[in-house]
Amino acid sequence: LHLAFASTDGRVGYMDSCADGERLRTWWAWGSGPDDLAYVDMTDELYELTGADALFATSGGTVAHDGAVALPYVVRVGDATHVRVVYARAGRLVGAADPLVGDGGVLLDETTLSVWDGRLVANCRLQGFEGRGSGVRYLAWGDGRTWEGGCLWELDDPGCKARMVGDLFVHPGRRDARAGGEVVRL
């Protein structure tokens, strides 16, 4: 079990977090289950790696890739944002992928990861109001360190939390009827 989460000692949030000032803290926890977790503060290491003013672990799902857990983060540097996947093994940072930036100015948010045909696949909700029920998500794929391609994927998506498992995408369903949910094959 691996967890990534944020906390704050004060009143700072994502939009007013600053690398050289008060900022969101980043934590990892890992163990064999909820009653057996070890914790480590990754704030300094992740801010240094990414050059971030703010970052948080996305609420999408993750996978193991090449023997490490892939953890997706939304990273803000000034006014620019991107997704950054970092790799953890037993509370240690063991690698990172290149920054993932959406084509054409699309801002990426909550990201679920999967491994499909040996490639790491990122399935991203769009950031901001346009991402909630916009009818598109952003897909990107690569070897786990570099992104080889990306595209907008049109589907009826309410912009909510979602999960990929292999080539299956599980999400709440239409914006006006979430009760049943949907499973969509990529």
Listing of model-derived features with the role each one plays in the protein:
Residues 1-55, 63-110, 114-160, 165-186:
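Beta-rich carbohydrate-recognition and catalytic domains
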